[in-house]
C-alpha cells in the first residue's frame, strides 16, 4: 500500500506550515534533536544547544520529556548503568523547562551533581559514555489525531523517518519522512512524497501545541555514538503550529 501510494503521490509543498507527526517521527525528533543535546558530555564539550539552559523555559507548557531506563519491556531498559549506578527515570524537560541532563560519573563531577545512571558501553572493551535509554515526550490532552487536525486549514501529516541530520551544537535538524499526507480543512487529502522537515530544536519545542494522550515507545532501534547501544524512543502523535 505504501509503495502504491508513493507512485501517485505529489511533491510536498515548501514553506512553513502546521505539522502533525506520528509517534515514530516524534520519537526520532525527541531522540536525535533533543536527547543528544541533553547528554552532559556534549554539554561539557560545548557541543550542545542546551549548554547553560538548565532551569530555563525551552519548550511550550505541554512539553515534558523523560529518559527512562526502568520502562518494563523497553528496548533501552537496564537496571544498573555500566559504572554501577542504579538507574531511574530522568525528566529532561518538565512543562517546557529544561530540568536535567543525562550524565555519568565524570560529567556529574564536572557539574557538581550526582550521577543519574546514564553511563553505557557497547561491551566490556569500550569505555562507558553518556547515552540515552528509552526517551519519549509524554502525552497531552487530545484523544485522537482527528482532534489535532480539526482546526488545521492547510498543513502536513508526516509518518516515520528515512533518516536525517542533526547539529547538536547549533541545534538544527533535518529529517525525511517515510510517508506524508496533505491536511486540508482538518482532513487528510493528497498523499505526498519527498517530505523533509527541518528547523531549530528550540523553536520547534516552543511550537508544540498539541499531543494525544497515548504516549508509547515506537519501534526499537540502536543508537550510534562511536559505540552502538539499544534504545527506545517514541511519544504520542504531536502537532506543531509551524515547522
Regions found by a protein language model. Give the residues of each.
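N-terminal small-residue-enriched
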Residues: 1-243
Amino acid at each position: 500500500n505504501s509503495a502504491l501510494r508513493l507512485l501517485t503521490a505529489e511533491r510536498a509543498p515548501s514553506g512553513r506550515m502546521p505539522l502533525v507527526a506520528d509517534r515514530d517521527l516524534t520519537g526520532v525528533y525527541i531522540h536525535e534533536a533533543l536527547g543528544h543535546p541533553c547528554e552532559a558530555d556534549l554539554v561539557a564539550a560545548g557541543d550542545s544547544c542546551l549548554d547553560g539552559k538548565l532551569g530555563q523555559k525551552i519548550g511550550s507548557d505541554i512539553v515534558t520529556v523523560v529518559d527512562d531506563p526502568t520502562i518494563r519491556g523497553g528496548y533501552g531498559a537496564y537496571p544498573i548503568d555500566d559504572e554501577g549506578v542504579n538507574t531511574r527515570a530522568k525528566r529532561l524537560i518538565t512543562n517546557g523547562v529544561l530540568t536535567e541532563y543525562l550524565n555519568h560519573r565524570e560529567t556529574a563531577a564536572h557539574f557538581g551533581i550526582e550521577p543519574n545512571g546514564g553511563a553505557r558501553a557497547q561491551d566490556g572493551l569500550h569505555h562507558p559514555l553518556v547515552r540515552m535509554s528509552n526517551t519519549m515526550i509524554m502525552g497531552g490532552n487530545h484523544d485522537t489525531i482527528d482532534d489535532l487536525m480539526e482546526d488545521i486549514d492547510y498543513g502536513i501529516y508526516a509518518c516515520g523517518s528515512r533518516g536525517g541530520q542533526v547539529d547538536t551544537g547549533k541545534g538544527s535538524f533535518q529529517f525525511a519522512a517515510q510517508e506524508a499526507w496533505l491536511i486540508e480543512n482538518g482532513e487528510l487529502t493528497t498523499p505526498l512524497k519527498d517530505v523533509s522537515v527541518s528547523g531549530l530544536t528550540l523553536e520547534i519545542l516552543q511550537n508544540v501545541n498539541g499531543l494525544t494522550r497515548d504516549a508509547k515507545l515506537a519501534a526499537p532501534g540502536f543508537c550510534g555514538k562511536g559505540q552502538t547501544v539499544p534504545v527506545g524512543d517514541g511519544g504520542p502523535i504531536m502537532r506543531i503550529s509551524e515547522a
